[in-house]
Amino acid sequence: MKHTRVKLTVFTLAVTIILAMVLTACGSESGTQTNAPVSSSTSDSTLPTSITDVYGRTVELPEEINSTVCLGAGALRMVCYAQGEDKVIGVEEAEHQQTLAKAYNYLNYDKFKDLPIVGQGGSGGNTPYEEEIIKVNPDVIIAAYTQQEADKLQAKTGIPVVCVAYDGIFDPTMDQSLELIGTLLGKQERCKEVIDFMQAAKQDLNNRTKDIPDDQKPTVFS
């Protein structure tokens, strides 16, 4: 049983890493095919006049969204999963360092390294640089912030702040966040493909572990 649990731990961790790499790689300019589907659509529908974020905040939107900045843990990652990195015009300071630990950063580093820094991010926590954000003037801010932080930032910058949440690739709030990002950036079809891909991977893991008692299932930190 111990040997089985070790194998499952390694397998689950490997799947988590591979998922992150595959989902991000789909948005790169390489012609190499991957197992995850890639949408050929660049824009799916007309932008609504307002949107309700993960906290139930109703945020008024501009007529068009051609640019964004992403703040907080997971926000930029999910935008890259949605293949919306071309609309990013500012990044947090941590994105100016290339790292394999963040596949989306590693694959898009040549773009991110030259973008203005609009927040601290990383271990520095949620510290937006309001003046720099106003300078780059994005159409919308996508932020993995608390409701209070988002309200404060929106009041200071005058720019719509839509809150998303990233609690892991199999968390329901990530599905909701991807749907929000898809609507904001005109990537609904792509985001649906990503959600379906992750749900299929989750179901596969559940099928592989269904005969193991819950108290004997290994846990993985990713």
Predicted regions and their residues:
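Structural recognition of the beta-strand scaffold that forms the well-ordered cores
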Residues: S67-G72, I89-E92, V140-A144, V161-V164, ...
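Bacterial N-terminal signal peptides that target proteins for export
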Residues: M1-L13
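Bacterial signal peptide processing site
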Residues: G27-S30
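Solvent-exposed loop/turn segments at secondary-structure junctions
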Residues: G74-R77, A94-Q97, V140-I141, T146-A150, ...
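C-terminal motif of bacterial Sec signal peptides marking the signal peptidase cleavage site
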Residues: A20-A25
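A short, structured surface patch at a secondary-structure boundary
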Residues: L76-E132, V140
